[in-house]
Each structure stands twice: as C-alpha cells, then as structure tokens.
Amino acid sequence: SPKERAECHFQNGVKMITALSCCADSHSDLGLITFVAIDQINIAKSFGVTDSSMCTQFAKLNLKAGESSMEKFNFMSGFSYIEHGISFLPKESKWNSSSYDLCRSLHEAACLACYVNALPTKANEYISVLLENAQCLEHKLKAYYVMVKNLTSSGDFKQALKKTFDVLIELGETFPTEITPEIIQEELSNTKSLLNNFTKESILSSPKLMDEKKLWAIKFMNNLSGPLSITNYQMGPLIACRMVQLSSKYGYCSESAFGFLGYGQAQISVFEDVDEGYRWGKIALSLLESLGGKGYLPKMRCLFNSYVSLWKEPFHASSNVLLHTHSEAMLVGDVEYASVSAFFYCRQALVCGQNLLLAEKECKAIASKMVQLKQIQMCYGQVNTYIFILKMNGNYGKVNPFPEIFDGKIANEEELLNLALSSGKRINAKGILSNRFQVAFWLGQFEEAAELAEKAKHPPKMSFMEVYHVFCEGLTAFQLARRSSSSSASKWMTIGEEAVTRFRLYEKCSTWNWENNLFLLEAEYHQCKQEEDKAAAKYRASIKSAQEHRFVHEEALALEFYGDFLRTIRSVDESKEKYGNARLCYEKWGAHAIIPRLEEKIGQIQGTE
C-alpha cells in the first residue's frame, strides 16, 4: 500500500542518516548518500509518514541539500529541498528562539531560489515572511537583496533604486542627490590617486573583506548597474568609485572587481580615455577570476563585452562572446545577465550585418525567453530591436512583436515609448527614438531622419548608441546639405563635419569596427565640397574596408552612395553597376524594405539610356 511504501522510504532514510552520523566525513560518497537519505525522508513525508522528534534534523538536512544544489547552480532541485525543509518546521513556533536561525536560513534560500526560477510572486511571499520576523537589519539584508533584483527584473526601477539607497543609508553609505560633472570628476580623481600604486598582486595579497556591513554595501552597489544604466547613468561612476574605495580600505571581495570595471567604463565615458578604460576592464576580468567569483563571471563578461571591448575588439568577436555568455549565465542561475547578454548579442549581431530574417527569428525567441524568465525590463530593449528588424526586412505590420509581452498592455511602438517615458526609463526612450531615426535614415527618408535625430539627441557619450547616432546623423546632414539652399546648407555641413571629427576618434580606437564608416563620412564631405577625386577615393576605400571587415550592410550603403555620386558626375554605366552590387548586398543582409529604392534608381538609369 502507499502507506507501507512510505514507511519503507522513511526507514531507509533514517538508517542512512544514522549511518552518516556514525561515519562522519570518512565516506567518499557522503554527499551522494546525504541526498539519497533526505530524498527518502521527503518522499515519506509526502504520504504523511514522518517522526516529529526528528523534524529539526530533517529540516537541517534539507537546508544542507538545498544550499549544496544551489552552489552547483541546480536551483530547481535546491528550491524543492528548501520547501521540504520549511515544511518540517512546526507552524506555530518555527520563528521561536530555538529554530530562528534555521528558519531564517531556509527562508533566505527560498527567496533566492524563487527569483532564479522565475517565481517572483512566490519570492515576494518568502521575502514578506522574512522581513516580518527578522530581528535586525543584518537578518533582513538577503531578503532586501532579492527584493531589489525582483523589482529590477520587473522594470520597477523607481522602487528598486529607492530600496537600494535606503538600505545603503542604513549601512552607512550615502550619495549626493544631484550629480554634477564636477562631483564625478572629483571622485574619479580621488580614486585615481588611491590606485596609483595598485597592482593585481597587491589586491590578492590584501585581507579579504570581513566587515559584514561593508560587504553588503558593496553587494547592493553591484546591483545598481542595471537600473542606473537606464535611468541615471551619470551616477554609475560614483558607485564604482565608492566600491573601489571601500574595498581598498576594508578588504576585497568578488564584487570589488565590478568597482574596477565601472571605474574603467568611467575613463571611457567621462574622459574618453579608451586605452585606460580598456586596461581597467581587463584588470577587472582577471581580478574576478583570481578572487574566485565563478558565479559572477558571466555578468562580468557581459558588461565588459557590451561597454568596454567594443572600443578595441571586433564586433564579430564580442558578439560571439555575448552569445556564449548568455548560456553561461543561465547555467549559474544569473537570469538577469543571461537576458542582458542576449539583448546585447542581438544588438551587436545587427551591426555586424547579420541576416535580418535570421535576426528576426533569434530576436523573437530571445524576447519569449525573457518573458519566461520574468525579465520584463529587458523586453523593452529587445522589442525595440525586434521592431527595427521588422521595419528593415519588410515584415513590419505582418508580424506582431507584442502579443505575449507585457501581458497585452502594450499594443504598439508608441505605447512602448510612452511607457518608457512615464516610468523614467530615459535610455529605453532614447533607444526607441534612436531606432526610429535609424530606420528613417536607412530607408532614405532624410528629412524625417533629421527631425528624429533631433529628438534622439544627446545619447550617453562614448557609447554604442552615440556611435551610430553620429554616423547616421552625419550622413543625413551631408545629404541635406546638397539639397538645401546656401543659407541652410552651412548648418548641415557643420553637423556633418562634427560627425567626421567624432568618427576620427572612434576609428583610432577600432579600425576594424569603424574605418569604413569614417571613409564614407569623408567621401560624403568631399562630395559636398565638390572634390570629386577625393570623394571617389574615399567611397572606394569605404567599400573595400566594409568588405574586408565583413560589414555587408555598410558595404551596401557605401555602394549605393557611390552610385549616387557617380550618377551626379554622369558616369552612368558605373553608377548602374554600383547600384546592382548594392542591391545584392542589401539582399544578402535581408533588408527587403530597402530593395525597391535600388530598383527605382536602376530603373531611372535604364529609362534614360
């Protein structure tokens, strides 16, 4: 009978537990036996068979099994053990003095397991119980930590930031409410002085961070990178500097490495010192590996390849790393940065000229995965990328990117923009406006593109978003300069010339990524100046560079613009040839929304023959 089977399971479990207590740590398969023993006990309990006098021991064993499973990144099994452990505690007295620590540990583990397993409602239930019964701030910190991650994942950045800064105040860390360039530069200067004699070896030989409050302060600061990058990126350098300063004073932990990475990012974004920023990014990677932060490595690789490596390494390399990092993050239970990695992979794959039909399938699958993982915040950016792809490959209006995302609350792009604006997600709003601008540019709607460029103005300096804003705005300006009267042409020429200057800085950082873009901007500049020989040479150089570095979409653009130039100097046959080659490249890219424009241009030439 079921009861007899349950009794058998129970007796087997008790015998193994008794054997474990006798053999202590001498048995080589002790870990496996522990899991088997507690599995037997849990099976028996599901049939109502247990021994109340041993409940505390069973709860402790389940806690041990759950924590061991989660250390091996098996969060589903871990949560099952934790739930069983809680079920063994007496309902009326589980929070009394004798079982308080055990009950608290089980609820702390349950919070984390629920978050990783995409069970936010369940996580909030455990968080509420823990906060209601915890006796001091230190006993509430793990609950607050998971609460902040839950809020971040759901996109409620306002509450996530408020709770984080409230906790940091209780931990003795305060920050200015208004950030000025002077404050940022002062903090970076102070941190630079602190790091003058820094070596990786000196950190590894330094004491570990033992002060629990300072350790938790750094942990909470490390949680801020996501929300601040969307709502208040100017705050990022201050957080990074504080993490470095606390680590230098009190000792180092795995999270300290992210302070060094943030410091490196600030060298790029504030001082435009790419070499120094890249150097600190590499140090941060190496430091985390040496400090043993295995679970944090995917997050570190994601941030490094999304914000730092693009200035020195080919996009084709970093996009592949991000795809691999997505899988790594899933394996260690970092569902937030699994989603962040996937988002940045999609974005970087696009600028590599990934086929847009393949990109559509990948983007849709990743958006669905984000919903499944309850990483709703990342859906803003992912859906925005998805819309861009659909507009470029001609499927916009045929495919609905919104049905399963945001629980049906968002039905179109305008509602997505309004939600981003109303919730204070400035970078998400900028991203939507920026993609609209770039679509108008690629579709040759230059007057509309110029208007949208103004709305999408002022993205973060030395950022991925800034680079492609400057590129498209510069080319748009040169197009409009040639179409305008002399009075307004000077305005457009100024914008175009500023883009050329900016791209000379970018190209010095990475010839692979941005040489072809610079050559195309220079070609358009020379055409506006009626310097035909120089323009032709730069067009050819742009086409060659795009071919060599495998940017098929930018090769197509350079071919088309070269064809336009040849047409203006009445080199009709060669112009037709370039248009034909451009069409082939656009087809390879999958940009079917652009191809009718090339067909029209080719038809116009044929009509004059």
Question: Which residue stretches match the model-derived regions?
Answer:
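Generic long, charged, amphipathic alpha-helical segments
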Residues: 57, 488-568
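Short coil/turn linkers that connect adjacent helices within long alpha-helical scaffolds
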Residues: 40, 47-52, 72, 91-97, ...
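Conserved small-residue packing positions in alpha-helical repeats and bundles
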Residues: 14, 21, 41, 65-66, ...
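Hydrophobic, small-residue-rich alpha-helical packing segments that form membrane-like cores
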Residues: 53, 241-251, 263-355, 361-374
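Residue at a conserved register position within TPR or TPR-like alpha-solenoid repeats
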Residues: 20, 24-27, 62, 69, ...
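TPR-repeat structural position
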Residues: 30, 55, 72-75, 120, ...
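Residue register of alpha-helical TPR repeats
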Residues: 11, 15, 53, 57-60, ...
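Amphipathic helix-loop-helix modules that constitute alpha-helical solenoid scaffolds
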Residues: 1-35, 45-64, 151-238, 350-364, ...
